Amino acid sequence: MNPMLTNNSQPSNYTAGNAKGKIKKLRSACDACHASKVRCSGEPICARCQRDNVACHYSYRAHQGKPKGSLNRKTIERMKAAGFIEQRQRPAASQPPGHGTSRDSSVCASGTTTDNLLNFIEIQPPGESNESPVAIHATPSPCFAMTGGLLPDFDAANLDAFLEAYQTPEDSCLRAVEEFPGASPADMDCIFIGTPSSMSRDYTEVATCRCVREITQQINNVHAASADRSTTGLDDVLHYTREISACISGLLQCYSCGGQVQVFVLASVVLSLLMELMHPLLDSSTDTSRPRAQIRVGNYDMSGQLGDVLEKVIVRSIITKLRQVVDKFEMKADFLRSETAQAEFLKSEARRLKRGFGRIEEGTATLP
Protein backbone atom coordinates (compact mmCIF):
# COMPACT_ATOMS: atom_id res chain seq x y z
CA MET A 1 0.00 0.00 0.00
CA ASN A 2 1.34 3.39 -0.95
CA PRO A 3 1.87 5.47 2.22
CA MET A 4 0.86 8.68 0.44
CA LEU A 5 -2.67 7.40 -0.20
CA THR A 6 -4.55 8.17 2.98
CA ASN A 7 -8.12 7.62 4.01
CA ASN A 8 -8.87 11.27 3.22
CA SER A 9 -8.05 10.80 -0.44
CA GLN A 10 -11.01 10.18 -2.73
CA PRO A 11 -11.27 10.14 -6.49
CA SER A 12 -12.32 13.40 -8.16
CA ASN A 13 -15.66 12.00 -9.28
CA TYR A 14 -16.67 11.03 -5.76
CA THR A 15 -20.09 12.29 -4.66
CA ALA A 16 -21.83 12.30 -1.31
CA GLY A 17 -25.22 13.33 -0.01
CA ASN A 18 -25.82 15.71 2.85
CA ALA A 19 -28.63 15.95 5.35
CA LYS A 20 -30.78 18.02 3.00
CA GLY A 21 -30.49 15.47 0.22
CA LYS A 22 -28.36 17.68 -2.02
CA ILE A 23 -25.51 16.00 -3.85
CA LYS A 24 -22.07 17.37 -3.01
CA LYS A 25 -19.19 16.87 -5.41
CA LEU A 26 -15.47 16.93 -4.83
CA ARG A 27 -13.24 19.42 -6.57
CA SER A 28 -11.45 18.34 -9.72
CA ALA A 29 -8.18 19.57 -8.15
CA CYS A 30 -6.71 18.56 -4.82
CA ASP A 31 -6.35 21.05 -1.98
CA ALA A 32 -2.63 21.61 -2.59
CA CYS A 33 -3.04 22.31 -6.30
CA HIS A 34 -6.15 24.38 -5.67
CA ALA A 35 -4.35 26.55 -3.10
CA SER A 36 -1.34 26.94 -5.41
CA LYS A 37 -3.61 27.58 -8.42
CA VAL A 38 -1.83 25.09 -10.62
CA ARG A 39 -3.20 22.40 -12.88
CA CYS A 40 -3.98 19.13 -11.12
CA SER A 41 -4.00 15.73 -12.80
CA GLY A 42 -7.18 14.79 -10.90
CA GLU A 43 -5.95 11.33 -9.90
CA PRO A 44 -6.49 9.92 -6.40
CA ILE A 45 -2.89 10.93 -5.78
CA CYS A 46 -2.03 13.63 -8.29
CA ALA A 47 1.37 13.83 -9.94
CA ARG A 48 2.36 16.98 -8.02
CA CYS A 49 1.58 15.51 -4.59
CA GLN A 50 3.30 12.28 -5.54
CA ARG A 51 6.35 14.22 -6.65
CA ASP A 52 6.46 16.33 -3.48
CA ASN A 53 5.59 13.32 -1.30
CA VAL A 54 2.70 15.08 0.46
CA ALA A 55 -0.80 13.93 1.36
CA CYS A 56 -3.24 14.41 -1.52
CA HIS A 57 -6.70 15.39 -0.32
CA TYR A 58 -9.80 16.45 -2.27
CA SER A 59 -12.32 18.73 -0.58
CA TYR A 60 -15.93 19.29 -1.52
CA ARG A 61 -16.76 22.06 -3.93
CA ALA A 62 -17.88 25.39 -2.56
CA HIS A 63 -21.48 26.51 -2.96
CA GLN A 64 -22.06 27.34 -6.59
CA GLY A 65 -24.38 30.07 -7.80
CA LYS A 66 -24.77 33.82 -7.75
CA PRO A 67 -24.34 35.83 -4.55
CA LYS A 68 -27.40 36.37 -2.43
CA GLY A 69 -29.34 39.41 -3.60
CA SER A 70 -28.11 39.35 -7.20
CA LEU A 71 -30.61 39.54 -10.03
CA ASN A 72 -30.79 37.25 -13.00
CA ARG A 73 -31.83 38.28 -16.48
CA LYS A 74 -35.51 37.39 -16.12
CA THR A 75 -35.79 39.21 -12.80
CA ILE A 76 -34.24 42.34 -14.31
CA GLU A 77 -36.69 42.20 -17.22
CA ARG A 78 -39.64 41.91 -14.82
CA MET A 79 -38.37 44.83 -12.77
CA LYS A 80 -37.92 46.95 -15.89
CA ALA A 81 -41.49 46.21 -16.89
CA ALA A 82 -42.69 47.20 -13.41
CA GLY A 83 -40.61 50.41 -13.43
CA PHE A 84 -38.34 49.61 -10.48
CA ILE A 85 -35.12 50.03 -12.46
CA GLU A 86 -36.02 53.58 -13.47
CA GLN A 87 -36.79 54.45 -9.85
CA ARG A 88 -33.35 53.20 -8.80
CA GLN A 89 -31.59 55.20 -11.51
CA ARG A 90 -33.65 58.36 -10.96
CA PRO A 91 -31.80 59.60 -7.82
CA ALA A 92 -28.49 59.39 -9.69
CA ALA A 93 -29.86 61.50 -12.51
CA SER A 94 -31.15 64.16 -10.09
CA GLN A 95 -27.70 65.02 -8.71
CA PRO A 96 -26.39 68.61 -9.03
CA PRO A 97 -24.84 69.44 -12.41
CA GLY A 98 -21.14 68.76 -12.69
CA HIS A 99 -18.22 70.52 -14.36
CA GLY A 100 -19.54 70.08 -17.89
CA THR A 101 -22.98 71.57 -17.27
CA SER A 102 -23.69 74.68 -19.31
CA ARG A 103 -25.05 77.90 -17.96
CA ASP A 104 -28.41 77.29 -19.63
CA SER A 105 -29.35 74.75 -16.98
CA SER A 106 -29.09 77.38 -14.23
CA VAL A 107 -30.60 80.32 -16.13
CA CYS A 108 -34.18 80.95 -15.19
CA ALA A 109 -36.13 78.19 -16.89
CA SER A 110 -39.69 77.17 -16.46
CA GLY A 111 -40.11 74.21 -14.12
CA THR A 112 -43.83 73.84 -14.64
CA THR A 113 -46.02 73.15 -17.61
CA THR A 114 -47.43 76.29 -19.17
CA ASP A 115 -51.15 76.62 -19.11
CA ASN A 116 -52.76 75.35 -22.30
CA LEU A 117 -54.86 78.46 -22.64
CA LEU A 118 -51.79 80.69 -22.51
CA ASN A 119 -49.96 78.57 -25.07
CA PHE A 120 -52.58 79.23 -27.75
CA ILE A 121 -52.22 83.01 -27.45
CA GLU A 122 -49.58 84.72 -29.56
CA ILE A 123 -47.77 87.28 -27.45
CA GLN A 124 -45.62 90.08 -28.79
CA PRO A 125 -43.14 91.29 -26.16
CA PRO A 126 -43.70 94.92 -25.26
CA GLY A 127 -41.27 97.52 -26.49
CA GLU A 128 -38.07 97.89 -24.53
CA SER A 129 -38.07 101.02 -22.41
CA ASN A 130 -35.01 103.24 -22.73
CA GLU A 131 -35.88 105.23 -19.67
CA SER A 132 -33.76 104.73 -16.60
CA PRO A 133 -35.61 103.03 -13.76
CA VAL A 134 -37.00 105.50 -11.29
CA ALA A 135 -38.33 105.01 -7.81
CA ILE A 136 -41.13 102.49 -7.50
CA HIS A 137 -43.81 104.00 -5.30
CA ALA A 138 -46.69 101.68 -4.65
CA THR A 139 -50.06 103.35 -4.91
CA PRO A 140 -53.09 102.46 -2.83
CA SER A 141 -55.28 99.79 -4.34
CA PRO A 142 -58.19 97.67 -3.11
CA CYS A 143 -55.95 94.63 -3.04
CA PHE A 144 -53.24 96.16 -0.85
CA ALA A 145 -55.79 97.84 1.38
CA MET A 146 -57.19 94.44 2.28
CA THR A 147 -53.94 92.50 2.33
CA GLY A 148 -51.73 94.56 4.56
CA GLY A 149 -50.60 97.99 3.39
CA LEU A 150 -48.37 99.39 0.68
CA LEU A 151 -45.26 98.06 -0.98
CA PRO A 152 -42.11 99.79 0.37
CA ASP A 153 -40.14 102.13 -1.87
CA PHE A 154 -37.62 100.28 -4.03
CA ASP A 155 -35.66 102.61 -6.33
CA ALA A 156 -32.66 102.15 -8.61
CA ALA A 157 -30.20 103.30 -5.93
CA ASN A 158 -31.50 100.63 -3.57
CA LEU A 159 -31.14 98.06 -6.33
CA ASP A 160 -27.50 99.04 -6.89
CA ALA A 161 -26.80 98.93 -3.17
CA PHE A 162 -28.47 95.55 -2.93
CA LEU A 163 -26.42 94.10 -5.78
CA GLU A 164 -23.22 95.43 -4.22
CA ALA A 165 -24.10 93.94 -0.84
CA TYR A 166 -25.21 90.65 -2.33
CA GLN A 167 -22.31 89.18 -4.29
CA THR A 168 -23.70 86.88 -6.93
CA PRO A 169 -21.84 83.68 -7.78
CA GLU A 170 -21.31 85.02 -11.28
CA ASP A 171 -19.52 88.13 -10.04
CA SER A 172 -17.20 86.07 -7.88
CA CYS A 173 -16.44 83.73 -10.76
CA LEU A 174 -15.76 86.58 -13.19
CA ARG A 175 -13.33 88.22 -10.78
CA ALA A 176 -11.47 84.97 -10.33
CA VAL A 177 -11.32 84.39 -14.09
CA GLU A 178 -9.08 87.45 -14.47
CA GLU A 179 -6.44 85.60 -12.47
CA PHE A 180 -6.89 82.51 -14.61
CA PRO A 181 -4.14 82.37 -17.30
CA GLY A 182 -5.41 82.05 -20.83
CA ALA A 183 -9.09 82.29 -19.93
CA SER A 184 -11.30 83.70 -22.64
CA PRO A 185 -14.83 85.16 -22.32
CA ALA A 186 -16.21 82.05 -24.00
CA ASP A 187 -14.81 79.93 -21.18
CA MET A 188 -16.53 81.88 -18.41
CA ASP A 189 -19.65 79.75 -18.59
CA CYS A 190 -17.83 76.53 -17.73
CA ILE A 191 -15.28 77.64 -15.09
CA PHE A 192 -15.92 76.75 -11.46
CA ILE A 193 -13.73 78.57 -8.97
CA GLY A 194 -14.17 78.58 -5.19
CA THR A 195 -13.88 82.04 -3.63
CA PRO A 196 -13.75 83.07 0.05
CA SER A 197 -17.34 84.29 -0.15
CA SER A 198 -18.56 80.98 -1.49
CA MET A 199 -16.36 78.94 0.85
CA SER A 200 -18.28 80.32 3.81
CA ARG A 201 -21.44 78.72 2.49
CA ASP A 202 -22.35 75.06 2.56
CA TYR A 203 -21.09 74.58 -1.00
CA THR A 204 -17.56 75.32 -2.15
CA GLU A 205 -18.02 75.45 -5.90
CA VAL A 206 -21.01 76.89 -7.71
CA ALA A 207 -21.86 77.36 -11.33
CA THR A 208 -22.16 80.73 -12.94
CA CYS A 209 -25.65 82.01 -12.29
CA ARG A 210 -27.65 84.92 -13.70
CA CYS A 211 -30.78 84.53 -11.59
CA VAL A 212 -30.31 87.79 -9.66
CA ARG A 213 -29.65 89.77 -12.82
CA GLU A 214 -32.64 88.21 -14.56
CA ILE A 215 -35.08 88.92 -11.75
CA THR A 216 -33.73 92.48 -11.36
CA GLN A 217 -34.34 93.02 -15.07
CA GLN A 218 -37.89 91.73 -14.63
CA ILE A 219 -38.44 94.25 -11.82
CA ASN A 220 -37.30 97.08 -14.08
CA ASN A 221 -39.49 95.88 -16.96
CA VAL A 222 -42.63 95.56 -14.85
CA HIS A 223 -41.95 98.91 -13.21
CA ALA A 224 -41.61 100.57 -16.62
CA ALA A 225 -44.92 99.03 -17.69
CA SER A 226 -46.68 100.06 -14.47
CA ALA A 227 -45.66 103.71 -14.92
CA ASP A 228 -48.84 104.15 -16.98
CA ARG A 229 -51.23 101.36 -16.12
CA SER A 230 -53.93 102.75 -18.37
CA THR A 231 -51.92 101.72 -21.44
CA THR A 232 -51.14 98.22 -20.19
CA GLY A 233 -52.98 95.62 -22.20
CA LEU A 234 -53.71 91.96 -21.71
CA ASP A 235 -50.84 90.95 -23.98
CA ASP A 236 -48.36 92.81 -21.76
CA VAL A 237 -49.64 91.08 -18.64
CA LEU A 238 -49.47 87.69 -20.36
CA HIS A 239 -45.91 88.34 -21.47
CA TYR A 240 -44.71 89.43 -18.03
CA THR A 241 -46.54 86.54 -16.37
CA ARG A 242 -44.71 84.01 -18.51
CA GLU A 243 -41.34 85.68 -18.04
CA ILE A 244 -41.68 86.11 -14.28
CA SER A 245 -43.12 82.63 -13.69
CA ALA A 246 -40.27 81.05 -15.64
CA CYS A 247 -37.68 83.18 -13.85
CA ILE A 248 -38.95 82.45 -10.33
CA SER A 249 -39.41 78.74 -11.05
CA GLY A 250 -35.81 78.51 -12.23
CA LEU A 251 -34.62 80.57 -9.28
CA LEU A 252 -36.26 78.22 -6.78
CA GLN A 253 -34.44 75.28 -8.40
CA CYS A 254 -31.06 77.02 -8.67
CA TYR A 255 -28.26 75.45 -6.59
CA SER A 256 -26.38 78.75 -6.27
CA CYS A 257 -28.92 81.32 -5.11
CA GLY A 258 -32.01 79.26 -4.34
CA GLY A 259 -31.29 79.49 -0.62
CA GLN A 260 -30.55 83.21 -0.31
CA VAL A 261 -33.03 85.43 1.54
CA GLN A 262 -32.22 88.48 -0.60
CA VAL A 263 -33.22 86.64 -3.76
CA PHE A 264 -36.56 85.67 -2.22
CA VAL A 265 -37.17 89.33 -1.33
CA LEU A 266 -36.64 90.27 -4.98
CA ALA A 267 -39.08 87.55 -6.03
CA SER A 268 -41.75 88.90 -3.70
CA VAL A 269 -41.19 92.43 -5.04
CA VAL A 270 -41.64 91.42 -8.68
CA LEU A 271 -44.76 89.38 -7.84
CA SER A 272 -46.23 92.36 -6.00
CA LEU A 273 -45.59 94.64 -8.99
CA LEU A 274 -47.17 92.11 -11.33
CA MET A 275 -50.21 91.89 -9.08
CA GLU A 276 -50.59 95.67 -9.18
CA LEU A 277 -50.26 95.58 -12.97
CA MET A 278 -53.22 93.21 -13.22
CA HIS A 279 -55.73 95.44 -11.42
CA PRO A 280 -56.70 97.55 -14.48
CA LEU A 281 -57.80 94.35 -16.23
CA LEU A 282 -60.68 94.05 -13.76
CA ASP A 283 -62.21 97.33 -14.98
CA SER A 284 -64.67 96.40 -17.73
CA SER A 285 -66.08 99.89 -18.20
CA THR A 286 -65.72 101.45 -21.64
CA ASP A 287 -64.41 104.72 -20.18
CA THR A 288 -60.94 103.36 -19.56
CA SER A 289 -58.22 104.12 -22.10
CA ARG A 290 -56.38 100.85 -21.76
CA PRO A 291 -56.18 98.57 -24.82
CA ARG A 292 -59.14 96.23 -25.08
CA ALA A 293 -59.06 92.65 -26.30
CA GLN A 294 -59.79 92.56 -30.02
CA ILE A 295 -61.59 89.45 -31.23
CA ARG A 296 -62.35 88.92 -34.88
CA VAL A 297 -64.13 86.00 -36.50
CA GLY A 298 -63.50 86.42 -40.19
CA ASN A 299 -64.51 90.00 -41.02
CA TYR A 300 -66.81 90.30 -38.02
CA ASP A 301 -65.52 92.26 -35.02
CA MET A 302 -66.62 90.51 -31.82
CA SER A 303 -64.85 92.84 -29.39
CA GLY A 304 -66.62 94.60 -26.58
CA GLN A 305 -68.55 92.48 -24.12
CA LEU A 306 -67.23 89.22 -25.55
CA GLY A 307 -63.71 90.60 -25.28
CA ASP A 308 -64.28 91.41 -21.61
CA VAL A 309 -65.48 87.86 -20.98
CA LEU A 310 -62.41 86.43 -22.66
CA GLU A 311 -60.12 88.75 -20.71
CA LYS A 312 -61.53 87.60 -17.38
CA VAL A 313 -61.22 83.95 -18.36
CA ILE A 314 -57.58 84.48 -19.29
CA VAL A 315 -56.91 86.44 -16.09
CA ARG A 316 -58.29 83.55 -14.03
CA SER A 317 -55.92 81.22 -15.86
CA ILE A 318 -53.02 83.58 -15.12
CA ILE A 319 -53.96 83.72 -11.43
CA THR A 320 -53.99 79.92 -11.24
CA LYS A 321 -50.47 79.78 -12.63
CA LEU A 322 -49.17 82.52 -10.33
CA ARG A 323 -50.69 80.90 -7.24
CA GLN A 324 -48.80 77.71 -8.07
CA VAL A 325 -45.58 79.74 -8.21
CA VAL A 326 -46.39 81.36 -4.85
CA ASP A 327 -47.07 77.93 -3.32
CA LYS A 328 -43.59 76.79 -4.35
CA PHE A 329 -42.19 80.06 -3.03
CA GLU A 330 -43.77 79.46 0.38
CA MET A 331 -42.62 75.84 0.57
CA LYS A 332 -39.06 76.82 -0.33
CA ALA A 333 -39.06 79.55 2.33
CA ASP A 334 -39.49 76.88 5.03
CA PHE A 335 -36.12 75.34 4.13
CA LEU A 336 -34.06 78.54 4.01
CA ARG A 337 -30.85 78.53 6.02
CA SER A 338 -31.66 81.81 7.74
CA GLU A 339 -33.05 83.23 10.92
CA THR A 340 -36.58 82.44 11.97
CA ALA A 341 -37.67 86.08 11.61
CA GLN A 342 -36.54 86.20 7.99
CA ALA A 343 -38.30 82.95 7.13
CA GLU A 344 -41.48 84.13 8.83
CA PHE A 345 -41.35 87.40 6.89
CA LEU A 346 -41.08 85.55 3.57
CA LYS A 347 -43.95 83.25 4.49
CA SER A 348 -46.08 86.25 5.44
CA GLU A 349 -45.28 87.78 2.05
CA ALA A 350 -46.40 84.56 0.38
CA ARG A 351 -49.68 84.64 2.30
CA ARG A 352 -50.18 88.31 1.34
CA LEU A 353 -49.63 87.48 -2.34
CA LYS A 354 -52.10 84.62 -2.10
CA ARG A 355 -54.73 86.91 -0.64
CA GLY A 356 -54.06 89.52 -3.30
CA PHE A 357 -54.35 87.05 -6.16
CA GLY A 358 -57.47 85.66 -4.50
CA ARG A 359 -59.08 89.12 -4.57
CA ILE A 360 -58.30 89.42 -8.26
CA GLU A 361 -59.75 85.98 -8.90
CA GLU A 362 -62.93 86.94 -7.08
CA GLY A 363 -63.15 90.07 -9.21
CA THR A 364 -63.12 87.98 -12.38
CA ALA A 365 -65.72 85.51 -11.11
CA THR A 366 -68.60 87.80 -12.11
CA LEU A 367 -68.81 87.94 -15.88
CA PRO A 368 -70.64 90.85 -17.54
From Swiss-Prot:
It is found in: Nucleus. Gene3D superfamilies: Zn(2)-C6 fungal-type DNA-binding domain. Residues 30-56 bind DNA. Keywords: DNA-binding, Metal-binding, Nucleus, Transcription, Transcription regulation, Zinc. SUPFAM superfamilies: Zn2/Cys6 DNA-binding domain. PROSITE patterns: ZN2_CY6_FUNGAL_1 (PS00463), ZN2_CY6_FUNGAL_2 (PS50048). Its main location: nucleus. One of its GO terms (cellular component) is nucleus. One of its GO terms (biological process) is positive regulation of transcription by RNA polymerase II. One of its GO terms (molecular function) is DNA-binding transcription factor activity, RNA polymerase II-specific. Pfam families: Zn_clus. Residues 84-109 are annotated as: Disordered. Transcription factor that specifically regulates the thioclapurine biosynthesis gene cluster. This is C6 finger domain transcription factor tcpZ. It comes from Claviceps purpurea (strain 20.1).
